[in-house]
A protein has these predicted regions:
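Active-site and adjacent substrate-binding regions of carbohydrate-active enzymes
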Residues: 1-254
């Protein structure tokens, strides 16, 4: 339910604007979308919904899949008090990640999914779980963790200056990336191993982010690849990375 026709809370979606969209045909009913309005969040508090999700996962496992990359999984649990947050921008909204992921109870969902869907198939699972604190890493990865491993996002986020995808230093200061990489490698040692990345679909090409344009070439790209491959963990390559693909700016009309 909304507040006199207004959204229930002042939460901002990852793509900007309110996380709330009016349900067609209703004046004061809203649905929540952490990302695009075309992607309504599923209600994981509903046991029937969870059962259908598990049914679909197991169907795919029965087809012979070896595992899953589990995208945006830290958003499945919400703060059910539905409270407004202190605005963190001129739009009067606050980022939705502040009320997801860190909310008590998400582990219950993740453990249930592991026991029901992944353990019976000995599946490999790679969770997109950002900003997991050092003290709870063993809950997330390894033999007793929710996932086999999670992506090592922290080094790739060292370039961020603001809240948005485009708020970054480019090329990234090497010392910042080096510091985050060494720190991340150290804290993960006792918990298990991570999935190491240079880039993915949410971030700039590593060749452009880490290498100044005047230094772009075979040797600098080879060095970047070796830095990733020589880290402890499981290396993940994003399509195009194998040929050293760089960014390109496109002009387009609305």
């Amino acid at each position: 339910e909304g507040k006199n026709g207004q959204p229930p809370t002042n939460w901002r979606s990852y793509f900007g604007g309110s996380v709330w969209e009016k349900v067609p045909g209703y004046e004061n009913k809203f649905y929540l979308h952490s990302f695009a309005k075309e992607q309504p969040d599923l209600n994981w508090e509903n046991e029937v919904v969870r059962e259908k999700i598990y049914e679909m996962i197991c169907w795919w496992m029965d087809q012979g899949l070896a595992g899953f990359r589990i995208d945006a999984i830290m958003n499945i649990k919400k703060d059910l008090t539905w409270s407004d947050l202190e605005p963190d921008g001129p739009d009067g909204l606050a980022d939705v990640y502040k009320v997801t992921g860190k909310v008590k109870g998400i582990g219950d969902f993740l453990l249930e999914m592991k026991h029901r869907c992944f353990e019976p198939y000995n599946a490999l699972t790679v969770g997109e779980a950002m900003f997991v604190k050092e003290e709870i890493l063993p809950q997330f990865i390894g033999d007793q963790g929710y996932f086999s491993t999670i992506f090592a996002f922290e080094p790739c986020h060292a370039y961020r200056k603001g809240k948005n995808y485009m708020d970054y230093d480019w090329p990234q200061p090497f010392d910042d990336w080096k510091k985050e990489t060494f720190h991340n490698q150290k804290i993960i040692e006792k918990a298990g191993f991570e999935a190491n990345i240079i880039e993915n679909h949410d971030q700039p090409r590593g060749a452009s982010l880490f290498i100044p344009e005047e230094d772009y070439g075979f040797y600098s790209l080879s060095a970047l690849a070796m830095i990733m491959l020589c880290q402890r963990g499981l290396p993940f390559l994003y399509q195009g990375q194998e040929i050293g693909m760089s960014n390109r700016r496109w002009e387009y009309a609305e």
